[in-house]
Amino acid sequence: MNTTSLSYRDAGVDIDAGDALVENIKPFAKRTMRPEVLGGIGGFGALVEISKKYKEPVLVSGTDGVGTKLKLAFDWNRHDTVGIDLVAMSVNDILVQGAEPLFFLDYFACGKLDVAQATEVIKGIAAGCEQAGCALTGGETAEMPGMYPAGEYDLAGFAVGVVEKSKVISGRDIVPGDVVLGLASNGVHSNGYSLVRKIIDRAQPELDAPFDGDKTLRDAVIAPTRIYVKPLLKLMETLPVKGMAHITGGGITENTPRVLPDNTVAQIDAASWQLPKLFQWLQREGNVDIQEMYRTFNCGIGMVVVVAPEHAEQALALLREAGETVYRIGQVRERQGGEHQTQIA
């Protein structure tokens, strides 16, 4: 019988490494704090009060991950921006219902904790929270020996926001004649990477050659998801927004109908914006049909916004003033029979 004394570290879990990570990330989390947050990082739960400016506050929650984009982060040792992706996926989702993101939590799981690597990831999460104006109030770092290969991890994020009950955006007021605007994406964002990786494997491109201006192909592929919170909150404060759709898995084709009444169609003009160079490359190298592109990728449009025609020009001007590239990409019309609710031509 072996009587050697064993420790948790012998089993593969390093509590000291976890403590070191917490100390590393505290200053980054502190920069994200909002006045509604009571207390700091390290408690069993985060306390957040609802501002008294809300008469009938409605909490809006969302959760998401980064998907197989993480495989590229592992392969390329690029961990500094996947945290931004993680935040973007959840805060953009709750934003479309009119919610201002209040706080964010993350879950980081790995087989063996690499403190430097995890610090890079969580610094990115904090940067995303700063972009979104929400507080990083806590998270879970799960070191699980034998569950993940060396150097790999998984991420999940959770966002909670608040909206006045009378200002919830549901899309129910959208009618034929309304205008569809498209806010430019920053690249592939966080969806469609299984196909992206397959195309890269087939094409075997020179990833570090100049590709788009001063960007390499590698830079373009792994560019972080754009966070639309601040410009769209400003827009919602200024004029009525009827509906918004975050263009994620399923592309423009499958996400736009999520905000449309059943009797309407978004008629999208494909000529209203230019397919960005990265998507042109993916389509060419993968020989991907254009309609498959639209139902897989954002194709350059990361967020769809629907407004009344009388507000369209003002909305365009406000968003451009806020630094967004935005296009008038289509119009809502009446649905004919059982046709798909996104028509792109």
From Swiss-Prot:
A Pfam family recorded for this sequence: AIRS_C
UniProt pathway: Purine metabolism; IMP biosynthesis via de novo pathway; 5-amino-1-(5-phospho-D-ribosyl)imidazole from N(2)-formyl-N(1)-(5-phospho-D-ribosyl)glycinamide: step 2/2
GO molecular function annotations of the record: ATP binding; phosphoribosylamine-glycine ligase activity; phosphoribosylformylglycinamidine cyclo-ligase activity
Keyword Ligase appears in the UniProt entry: yes
Root EC class: ligase
Subcellular location: Cytoplasm
Lineage: Bacteria, Pseudomonadati, Pseudomonadota, Betaproteobacteria, Neisseriales
Family in the record: Belongs to the AIR synthase family.
Keywords, comma-separated and alphabetical: ATP-binding, Cytoplasm, Ligase, Nucleotide-binding, Purine biosynthesis
GO biological process: 'de novo' IMP biosynthetic process; adenine biosynthetic process
Enzymatic reactions: 2-formamido-N(1)-(5-O-phospho-beta-D-ribosyl)acetamidine + ATP = 5-amino-1-(5-phospho-beta-D-ribosyl)imidazole + ADP + phosphate + H(+)
Assigned EC number: 6.3.3.1
PANTHER family: TRIFUNCTIONAL PURINE BIOSYNTHETIC PROTEIN ADENOSINE-3, TRIFUNCTIONAL PURINE BIOSYNTHETIC PROTEIN ADENOSINE-3-RELATED
Name assigned to this protein: Phosphoribosylformylglycinamidine cyclo-ligase
GO cellular component: cytosol
NCBIfam families assigned to the protein according to its UniProt record, in alphabetical order: purM
